[in-house]
Amino acid sequence: VEQHFPELLDNLSTAKSPQQMFGAIAKSYFAEKLGVDRKRIVVVSIMPCLAKKYEASRPEFAVDGNPDVDISIYTRELARLIRYANINFAELPDSDFDRPLGESTGAGVIFGTTGGVIEAACRTAYELYTKKTLPKIDFEELRGLEGIRSATIDFDGTPIKIGIAHGLGNARKLIEQVQNGMSPYHAIEVMACPGGCIGGGGQPFHRGRMEVLRKRAAALYQEDRSKTLRKSHENPYIQALYACLLYTSDAAD
């Protein structure tokens, strides 16, 4: 959008990517909790995406020249580091991620597959909009691997039309609909890579085999189902962050 459709920038979500959200919180909230200067914290992200290296280096994601994310490596690089260090994962004990930034929900897990971001958003948006508990957590109609697909979600009597695309060629088609005033959608999810982040350029090579992407997506949905918390707004640490740091009167508006 920045390069080819700059006139549509105001239509984009104002939320940063998960990588940049984490970096900013780690070097503000977490640094304050530890009582250390942000420059003494090094944030390393492990990502499925090659473009995250560039994203982490963008000057708008830095404070006084100190980046929110210092180093971004992709999945295959991590695998090489593990092999280089002769780490045998089968021999490692299970452990939880560090808190407070290690707690996650099923909604966060499905971000990795096409349709997952908008499904996670719908789980929260439904409850915030209707003030009712979501009767069915899984939005099956948003799932699949078709390059372009659409669905209408019932928000307690209000139909919300969703468009989904993965792959840049498919994304362009939906964006051109918006540009031409022909888009029927209230919200659109776009992922650059086939299948979403599961097919990212930094992931183990799938070599265009859709069955590999299906299995990766199925694994994410299984992980989502196994979670106790499956909606983003149910995460107690996210709630605490909004209460003490992120919530403002502007956000309420």
What is each PLM-predicted segment?
Residues 13-16, 26, 202:
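Active-site adenylate/phosphate-handling loop in enzymes that bind or generate adenylated species
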